[in-house]
Amino acid sequence: MRSLPGMTIICPADDVEARAAVRAAYEMQGPVYLRFGRLAVPVFHDEANYHFEIGKGEQLTEGNDIAIVATGLMVNEARKAAETLAAEGIHARVLNIHTIKPLDEDIILKAAKECGKIVTAEEHNVIGGLGEAICSLLSEKLPTPVRRVGVQDKFGCSGPAWDLL
């Protein structure tokens, strides 16, 4: 979908963000692809105070040792990973990138500059998704080591959603 001209791609992290994304998509001109996972995820946004803006990521945790950049249901997994790393003395910055296209280049470049390494996490094929978009951005503007976590390039299987990840 990223290769389609003018396409907006949104992958919300929780119910509050999903509702806001649907409202924003309704107001947009042009095609929008809203990607929702099958699994129930914890709600961590406060609906009363949450502001959704297409193309603007969200920093969820402080940290300069590594940046974990996630989308969709993997945002909550990234938050849990940051807690695990903190217990080991590693301070991870977690970014919620709900809009894969257009990509929030500023927040990603800032994280790359300040952290020096990035892990991307998505419940999507590593080809054509968030990780590839970030690798493309960084290769041109700020070469930074990136490790992509996602579905490898193979045909899908059927089964319980967590087992498939």
Task: Mark where each language-model region is.
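Conserved thiamine diphosphate
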Residues: 1-27
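Charged, amphipathic alpha-helical interaction segments
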Residues: 23, 30, 83-87
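Divalent-metal (often Zn2+) His-rich catalytic cores of metallo-beta-lactamase-fold enzymes
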Residues: 34
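Glycine- and acidic-residue-enriched helix-capping/beta->alpha junction motif
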Residues: 24-31, 134-137
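Thiamine diphosphate
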Residues: 37-165
